[in-house]
């Protein structure tokens, strides 16, 4: 199928999705999760919005979490939405992992792309759910170029892979990290990308076997990043 974009700049097509169920949105948890009147909980696959505590002890809300939730409410609350699947359709909690379309003012809006374009989410993919990433990254790039939402907040800044002390302070979070890989090494079923000389102390990215299959399908050997 052809997925409509949310603006002319995002008019690329994505032919990998299959139509799923539809329903009316009756409650919203945060900027990427809501419930339908059918009882199905939907997790917007392919993106991650700023997180809220949602009853978790000691969990601090991420900046712009309330704004992301308010935007989703404005987009879909009380509206009939259509779900589309491009990979694994359920997570371990039983939530639908779906791309979501909603009609607004006579036009179909792709909710994930809209949140990215507004700078209220980042692309967030898994090996078993990578459909439409090119279009999603284009939407994210637009939000970043316009410095909207999270892209003007230091909390979401792209981290330096060589600054291991700063990264240590971000343990447990989801970060975008860039830098030079000083060493790439395969050990068993994993590949380690080391951004420092002392792997026990410096930042290291680990590619598990499932992720390595994605690299293989793309024709990329991650070992080429050695000293790159």
Model-derived segments and spans:
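Small beta-barrel nucleic-acid-binding modules, primarily SNase/OB-fold domains
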Residues: 5-228
